[in-house]
């Protein structure tokens, strides 16, 4: 995968394995630190690597853990243009040069109303808009076989909806320190927690 991204010129954010779980036993953090060292050593010579995300995604971890993960990345790749990032609301965010957030919409919706002009911002994932995590009652979740009109609603939601939401137009209008974002998701796919597929992608297996 990384070789293909190098060849095609696709940027990659390399994430540490782990999600929504923390264990206070000391060996848990030590194993995460080992994972970070190994993944940086594995991928540091790939041209496609744009950013490292060494913290555990959506996890309530100690503040000193965040600082240590940033230090580990810098130790394993002690060269210019080595960037690490985390969520703008995460513990230890002050240790990272890149923060993940949404455009602020003048403080009317998601985003960081206290954006720091010295920090680079990126929207790690945007687009999905649901009333619950199981249904498809959403302008962003549309199956291709539902027809043209639902697909146009989905396209408008992603491009420039009439309501306040992160979209292509909103990302285009951000100041230059906000360097873009990644749509969630690129393609329809099966979900492990529900029998119906996720229909929020720009593509499915047939297009």
Predicted regions and their residues:
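Substrate-binding/catalytic cleft of secreted carbohydrate-active enzymes
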Residues: 1-207
